[in-house]
C-alpha cells in the first residue's frame, strides 16, 4: 500500500434540526396547548486513532466529509433525531492543523484516542418552551444552527522508539529486517526504501518499535532526495541510530559520509540533532581483516565519544546484542 503522510480535507458538521410549532389537537381538548418538540443536534466529526492503520491514503482520494444533519422536531413534544457523528480513522501519531490559521488543533497518540474536529450545530427549540402566563399559544420557535466548517491538514508522524538514520545503502533496511518482522525492500541501489517502515523488535518479554526512513543525502535539508520529507518522522523517536557503511560499494569515504548526514540533520532541526544518538558501524563482514582496529580508527577520525556498535546486518552479526543494548537504553528512559 502506498505511504501517504500528509493530506488536506474539508469538514462540514451537521446542521441542527429546526424546532417545531405544533398544538395539541385531540377530541374533547378544544384548547390544547403547544406541543412542538425540539430538533436534533447536528452530527460532529471526530478523528480516531487506530494502530492497525499506517497511512493517510484513504484521504488522498476523498477530500470532503459531511456529518449528518439533525432532524426537525415534531408535534406531541417529539424531539428530532440527532445527526449521526462521523469518525475519521487515522494512524496513531496523526496531528491536525487548521488550514486557515495553520494552528495545531491537536493530535492522537494512543490507540482508540478520539479528537473532535468540528462540532455539530445546536438544535432548534420548539414552541412548547415559549408558553407563558401571558402567551398560552406561542408560535415562536428557533431554527437549528449551522454546523462548524473547517479545512484541515492531517500530518502523520510515525511513533517509533528508535529511528534509523543514514545514507542510502548504509544497510538500514537490512538491519530492521534482521531484528524485526518488517520486510522493507533491500537492493544495491540508492533509495530502495521509498517510504518509512516500522518494525517491532522483541527482546525477551519486552518489545520496541524501530523506524526505517529513506536515506539522507547531501542537500536533504534544502529538499534534495527523499530524506527531507521523511526526517519529520524522527521527531517523536526516543533515540536515533546513525548507521554507517564501513565499506561502501561506491568506494566513498565513510568519514565524509558520516559528517554529511550529521550536517544535514543539524541543518534540518537542532532539536533532532540533540536527540540521544548511537553510532552503528555496519557491513563489517566486508572488511578483510583487523575489523576492530579499522572501526576504532574510524571512530577516532570522526571524533565520536559515545557508544558505538559494530555489526553485519546481512549476516545478523552483532544485531542481537545491539537490540539488547537499545532495550536497556529505553528502559532507563522510562
Curated annotation (Swiss-Prot):
InterPro entries with a match to the protein in the record: G_OBG (IPR031167), GTP-bd (IPR006073), GTP-bd_Obg/CgtA (IPR014100), GTP1-OBG_CS (IPR006074), GTP1_OBG_dom (IPR006169), GTP1_OBG_dom_sf (IPR036726), OBG_GTPase (IPR045086), P-loop_NTPase (IPR027417)
The OBG-type G domain, residue ranges: 160-331
Domain of life: Bacteria
Binding-site positions, GTP: 166-173, 191-195, 212-215, 282-285, 312-314
Cofactor: Mg(2+)
Annotated localization: Cytoplasm
Obg domain mapped to chain residues: 1-159
Main location (coarse class): cytoplasm
EC number: 3.6.5.-
A Pfam family reported for this protein in Swiss-Prot or TrEMBL: MMR_HSR1
GO biological process: ribosome biogenesis
UniProt family annotation: Belongs to the TRAFAC class OBG-HflX-like GTPase superfamily. OBG GTPase family.
Its job: An essential GTPase which binds GTP, GDP and possibly (p)ppGpp with moderate affinity, with high nucleotide exchange rates and a fairly low GTP hydrolysis rate. Plays a role in control of the cell cycle, stress response, ribosome biogenesis and in those bacteria that undergo differentiation, in morphogenesis control.
Subunit structure as annotated in this protein's UniProt entry: Monomer.
HAMAP family membership: GTPase_Obg (MF_01454)
The protein's name in its UniProt record: GTPase Obg
Biological source species: Francisella philomiragia subsp. philomiragia (strain ATCC 25017 / CCUG 19701 / FSC 153 / O#319-036)
Lineage of source species: Bacteria, Pseudomonadati, Pseudomonadota, Gammaproteobacteria, Thiotrichales
